């Protein structure tokens, strides 16, 4: 009964309201027009040059950001043109577990990767730039951290790369040995800037000095 009364009361009150409103003069509506907004005049500002807008460079040809080989150095036989694009599969195959690496790269929103290799003064220098879409998180930072984690497991010394925040260079004090092959000493550097992760490796039959790996890493980061 109480529930029925409440419903009836609402209906009755609504009907009474309609009857009262019907006997009144209509209320005029406010004007629909809005004040005219002033429009901007003149030409739109010119886009910033690459020197002021980093995205102008990083959204262009990624190969143009690679460090050029020094005078007197030669590109390896399998890289005559000096530069190679790497698709997702090719990058994954550079890891010891390609299947797992492939899934990680998909998760990290891999966009593209490019590399260059040259031989100079008895050493082989390899530089790789990997770019991520970064729509979800800073994948370039994650990739650099992971690479540094692997490098820190090897015996050697390491130093921060100036101007990179947490970028680091590593020199291995013990050579990598494999039956049937010449022992190889390795130095590497890993850093990131924006949506690009940088990896550098320098290998050779003789120990790689700190100055060598730091010079390559710093000059490459300057181009980013």
Where would I find each of the regions flagged by the language model?
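Extracytoplasmic/secreted envelope proteins and their assembly/folding machinery
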Residues: 129, 142, 213-217
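Short Gly/Thr-rich strand-loop-strand
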Residues: 135-187
């Amino acid at each position: 009964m109480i529930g029925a009364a409440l419903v009836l009361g609402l209906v009755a009150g609504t009907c009474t309201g309609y009857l009262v409103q019907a006997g009144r003069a209509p209320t005029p509506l406010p004007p629909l027009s809005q004040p005219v907004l002033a429009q901007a005049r003149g030409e739109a500002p010119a886009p910033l040059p690459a020197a002021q807008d980093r995205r102008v460079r990083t959204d262009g040809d990624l190969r143009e950001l690679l460090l050029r080989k020094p005078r007197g150095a030669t590109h390896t036989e399998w890289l005559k043109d000096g530069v190679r694009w790497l698709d997702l599969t090719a990058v994954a195959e550079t890891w010891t577990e390609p299947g797992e690496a492939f899934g990680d790269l998909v998760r990290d929103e891999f966009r593209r990767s490019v590399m260059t290799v040259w031989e100079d003064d008895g050493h082989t220098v390899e530089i790789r730039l990997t770019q991520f879409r970064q729509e979800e998180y800073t994948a370039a930072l994650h990739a650099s951290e992971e690479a540094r984690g692997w490098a820190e497991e090897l015996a050697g010394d390491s130093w921060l790369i100036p101007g990179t925040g947490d970028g680091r260079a590593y020199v291995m004090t013990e050579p990598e040995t494999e039956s049937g092959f010449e022992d190889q000493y390795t130095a590497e550097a890993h850093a990131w800037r924006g949506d690009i992760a940088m990896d550098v490796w320098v290998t050779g039959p003789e120990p790689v000095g700190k100055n060598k790996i730091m010079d390559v890493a710093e000059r490459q980061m300057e181009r980013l």
